[in-house]
Amino acid sequence: SENKKKKDSFSNIKKIFGERISKANVATEEIAGIDISENSIKVAQLSKSKDDKWILEKISLRLLDKAKTIDGIIASKDYVAEELKLTMANAKITTSNVAISIPVTSAIIRVVTSPLMTDEELQKAIETDSLWENLVQLTDDLNEYSVFHQIISRNPKGNTMEILFVASKLSDVNSYSSIVKKAGLNPVIMDVKCFTLKNAFDNASKIENKINNALLEIGTEDNYL
């Protein structure tokens, strides 16, 4: 049935990300961060000091040949994978476990309004009904996407709630995962770039003792503080 097809698809998506993310739950594992754009590859590795402060241990940036990525990163997998190997070696990063950010252009991000539901009702609606098809107009089949959602706010008076909807094409997720694996690395975490930046800012805001913090973006096109 159609409902069974949707449930199976949802289960497959959860399995794909569950297998990757569960590997990152081991506290003793080291993980390096990777950012790949059509112009460059950036890698970094952090560590925590005894007083629970983050320390930037290793970092490296490598420019890519635009002539070789003119058709996009995904179409240049082999070249990008080799360049990623060199970037990791230049930074002297030895861990194979990595977290990778996916460009915003590879994701659909929207805030949608839905009827007010409990968490359980929302989960059931996602698994058994065409909730996202009704709330979000996608050009492709929803089964081709990996979907993340988070409730932003509930309005009991209006009997509505706002939900953050994020969808990444499974083909893009698999392509970025393939590039990382071709470089001999193990992708344990994947997230959309704008959310990785927000998480970094949120973590910096939690630092005590009122230390001044800055969020710095270094790139070939975007450089901001």
Name each region found by the language model.
Residues A32, L84-K92, L215:
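Short amphipathic alpha-helices and their capping/turn segments at secondary-structure boundaries
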Residues E38, E57, A75, Y79-E83, ...:
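Generic alpha-helix structural propensity
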Residues S1-K4:
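N-terminal targeting leaders characterized by basic, low-complexity, disordered sequences
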